[in-house]
Amino acid sequence: MVHMHITAWALGLILFFVAYSLYSAGRKGKGVHMGLRLMYIIIIVTGFMLYMGIMKTATSNMHMWYGLKMVAGILVIGGMEMVLVKMSKNKATGAVWGLFIVALVAVFYLGLKLPIGWQVF
């Protein structure tokens, strides 16, 4: 399940940047944007399944950290969607980019720090 979740995230980020480049070039990126929304669903479902699986075995304060990672992941998805919607409407995206980047850094940090992820830290 972890590999499916990581693959969904990787495809989601690729589709996000493809849709962003299409919108910023003035072309229609609606099809790619819809594909990205499908990836959002897959990311949320696989993430929730991972969360429920870890709740059976997590000890001490791991519940809290995985809950925070899930909230940060939902903020990343929200940030991605808000950036693309504002881009499609030709509105300013500065603050939304800030939300997206901060949440993405938090998700990657927690993903690398927590026991299920890679043991970099």
Curated annotation (Swiss-Prot):
One Pfam family linked to the record: DUF1516
Signal peptide extent: none
Protein's membrane topology: Multi-pass membrane protein
InterPro entries named in the record: UPF0344
GO cellular component: plasma membrane
Main location: membrane
Assigned keywords, A-Z: Cell membrane, Membrane, Transmembrane, Transmembrane helix
Keyword match Transmembrane: yes
Cell compartment(s), UniProt: Cell membrane
Superkingdom of the source species: Bacteria
Transmembrane spans: 6-26, 38-58, 65-85, 92-112
Family: Belongs to the UPF0344 family.
Protein name (record): UPF0344 protein BCA_1194
Organism annotation: Bacillus cereus (strain 03BB102)
